[in-house]
Amino acid sequence: MDIYAQTISSSESKVQRIAVSGNKFVNEAGQTIQFKGYSSSDPDKLVYNGKWNQAYFDEMKAWGANLVRFPIHPAAWRKHGKNAYQSLLDQGVAYAKNAGMYVIIDWHSIGNLKSELFQAENYETTKKETFEFWRAMAIRYKDNPTVAFFELYNEPTVYNGQLGTCTWAEWKALNEEMITIIRAHGCKAIPLVAGFNWAYDLTPVKDNPINATGVAYVSHPYPQKREKPWEDKWTADWGFVADKYPVILTEIGFCGADDIGAHIPVISDESYGDAMMAYCKKTGISYVAWVFDMNWAPRMFSDWNYTPSRQGKYWKAAMNR
C-alpha cells in the first residue's frame, strides 16, 4: 500500500522508525511511505527572526508536509558551537514531531569536500569538521526515529575545476566513511547521498553505487538544469536510480524571472511543478521544496503571516491534494 506518512501524531508516544526496503521507504508496519515537505531556512536564521517555534512547524504541516529538512550551514554551526546548535536542533526535532513530521538533517555546504574548496564563506568546512558533525548527530539522534534522514553533504561540485578535482570514486569513498562513522554509533538514520553538478547528477550510481545497504540517493533537479521537455532527461540523469534505490529530491522549486531572488537555475513557472508532481507520482520518488522562508529564494511566502508566494501557492495546493 502506498501512503503518505501519517505515522507521527502529538497524541502518539511512539514514532515509527523509517527504513529502506528495496527502492522504497517503509515504516515499521511495512507500509511504503512517499515523503513530501519543505526545507526550512537555517535554524540560525529562524532564531534571529523569532520564528524557530511550534507555530512555524504547524504552518508547514498545514501546507501539506510530512517531512522537514534542516539546512545547517557550517558557518552557523561554528557560530553557535556544537552544544548550543544541538540544543536548537533538539527544539526543532520536537517541534517537527509535535506537528507530525519527520526530519532530514542536512550538512549544508556547497563545493568540493575533497579539496576543501567551497563556493562561499558560509559553506566553508573541512573533512574533519564534517566527520565530527556526523559523529555528533549519530550520537545525539540514534534513538530518535523522528530524525529519519542524514543528508551527508548538500551540493557537491568542482565548479568546472575552479574548486579542484574529485572523481566519483573519491566522492563515494568520503560518503562511505561518513556512513561508517554514523553506523558505528548505532544510528539508524538513513544516509542520503548526492552526486556532482550541485547534487543533480546521479549517473555514476548505475555502475558504482555506494557500498552500503539501507542508503538513499538525492537530486536537486531545479528547472533550468535541463530544458523542456524534462522527463526523459530526468530519468537519464537521476530518475533511473529509483528502479533500485529510494530517491528523494531534497530541493525542488521555482520562481518567475521577475520575482524577488530569482536566479539560475530556479526560474520557471507552474509547468515545472506539474511535470515534477506527475513524475514523482509515477515513480514514487519523495520530494522537498525549497524554501519555507520569506527572504531566502525561491521563497514560499512573502511575509510572516505566511502569505503564499507564486510557488508557495503551487506547492501548498499540490501537497494538500
What feature does the model see in each segment?
Residues A29, I33-A55, W77-G81, F118-N122, ...:
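Acidic/histidine-rich helix-loop elements
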Residues Y4-L67, F196, A317-A318:
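N-terminal carbohydrate-binding accessory modules
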Residues R17, N49, E121, K128-F149, ...:
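Extracellular glycoside hydrolase catalytic/binding regions
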Residues D42-D44, P74-R78, G111-L113, P156, ...:
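Feature marks short, surface-exposed loop/turn motifs that line or immediately flank catalytic pockets
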